[in-house]
């Protein structure tokens, strides 16, 4: 039986500003963010099936990605995808790589839109196509920006009151202040809660070691992205028994394989826009599972469309390996799509609707800023 034909006929690109819901978001190194520039893609097949995807970098100073680069990258890639079958996701990624080396953040929205079409074309949710859903009610994690210790403690408490059981606490300054931030954020820790302490590459080995020595004994947390370079992170790892996970340095097949080879961490923060979408995200999930790692399925930033994609990927990770899914919608003050992605008591499950299960708000998206056909 011949497979029914399906081909990409048109790609429309939308731009939306997503204001940060808490005013100013602060990361190590004096980085501040007030809003995030989202690129949203609508891919249409010759049969009228629409697929949606989003790529929203965390500003221009988090990793080597920026919003203008997403749209200029799509301009390079999109014309080469017209006429291809969106269900052949690996072949789509081959075509994207042939059109543009790297620039994974530009490929993400296109890749996710293909998966949305694939799901709709066969009447299945994306998580079933990615390997099949678990029955795990997945914990979402908060994002607590770097600030005064007691203020961070207060913001953890506010998220706890909303039902969150996981918290990502940002650090990356002077050792004594960072130690105080961690101690304050964990001061009211409840049974079953977990904490990721994320320096976003902001520590040197020296400041990390000093900070760890200043901490009260027995605090239970995982240290994420302590240092900016691979060598520094491995050096720190050799001298501490604190569990470490990589994020900014876990970007590609090669880097995650090297992570395993070097025994450099216990897990990864898997952000699909950083890694290139769900096709590559699926592969990175599998490498991590083969290594026995824990996986935090996340996004750099993003609205409802980005959140839907990571919920579907997270839903395929076995419970013992799934650390959390990042509630990316929590940090933006604009809703771009509707769908059954309600967080209840700090947990979420992927819907059973075909594709991603979202309906974009076209009035919010406005008119396309570019179209390819």
Language model features with spans:
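Structured beta-strand/loop patches that form or line metal/cofactor-binding pockets in enzymes
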Residues: 2-52, 56-61, 329-334
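Metal- or metallocofactor-binding catalytic centers and their adjacent structured scaffolds
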Residues: 5, 10, 44-121
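Hydrophobic faces of well-ordered beta-strands that scaffold small-molecule active sites
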Residues: 53, 138-144, 167-169, 195-199, ...
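Shared catalytic-loop signature of beta/alpha-barrel
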Residues: 219, 228-243, 250-347, 351
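Extended hydrophobic packing segments that form well-structured cores
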Residues: 356-373
């Amino acid at each position: 039986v011949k497979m029914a034909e399906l081909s990409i006929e048109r790609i429309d690109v939308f731009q939306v500003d997503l204001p940060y819901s808490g005013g100013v978001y602060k990361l190590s190194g004096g980085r501040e963010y007030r809003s995030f520039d989202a690129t949203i893609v609508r891919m249409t097949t010759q049969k009228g099936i629409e697929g949606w995807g989003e790529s929203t970098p965390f500003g221009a100073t988090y990793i080597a990605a920026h919003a203008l680069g997403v749209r200029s990258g799509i301009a390079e890639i999109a014309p080469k995808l017209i006429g291809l079958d969106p269900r052949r996701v690996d072949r789509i990624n081959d075509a994207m790589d042939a059109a543009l080396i790297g620039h994974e953040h530009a490929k993400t929205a296109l890749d996710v839109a293909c998966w949305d079409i694939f799901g709709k074309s066969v009447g299945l949710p994306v998580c079933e196509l990615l390997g099949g859903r678990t029955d795990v009610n997945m914990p979402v994690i908060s994002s607590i920006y770097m600030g005064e210790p007691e203020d961070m403690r207060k913001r953890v408490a506010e998220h706890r009151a909303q039902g969150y059981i996981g918290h990502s606490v940002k650090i990356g300054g002077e050792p004594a202040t960072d130690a105080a931030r961690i101690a304050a954020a964990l001061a009211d820790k409840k049974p079953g809660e977990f904490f990721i302490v994320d320096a976003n590459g902001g520590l040197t080995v020296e400041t990390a070691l000093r900070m760890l020595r200043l901490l009260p004994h027995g605090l239970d947390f995982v240290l994420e992205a302590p240092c900016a370079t691979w060598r520094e992170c491995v050096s720190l790892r050799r001298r501490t028994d604190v569990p470490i996970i990589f994020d900014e340095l876990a970007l590609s097949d090669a880097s995650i394989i090297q992570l395993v080879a070097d025994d450099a961490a216990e897990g990864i923060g898997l952000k699909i826009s950083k890694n290139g979408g769900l096709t590559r995200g699926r592969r990175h999930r599998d490498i991590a599972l083969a290594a026995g790692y824990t996986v935090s399925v996340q996004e750099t930033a993003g609205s409802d469309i980005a959140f839907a994609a990571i919920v579907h990927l997270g839903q395929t990770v076995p419970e013992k390996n799934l650390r959390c899914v990042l509630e990316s919608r929590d940090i933006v003050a604009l809703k771009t799509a509707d769908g059954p992605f309600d967080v209840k008591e700090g947990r979420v499950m992927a819907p059973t609707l075909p594709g991603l299960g979202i309906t974009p708000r076209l009035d919010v998206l406005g008119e396309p800023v570019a179209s390819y056909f």
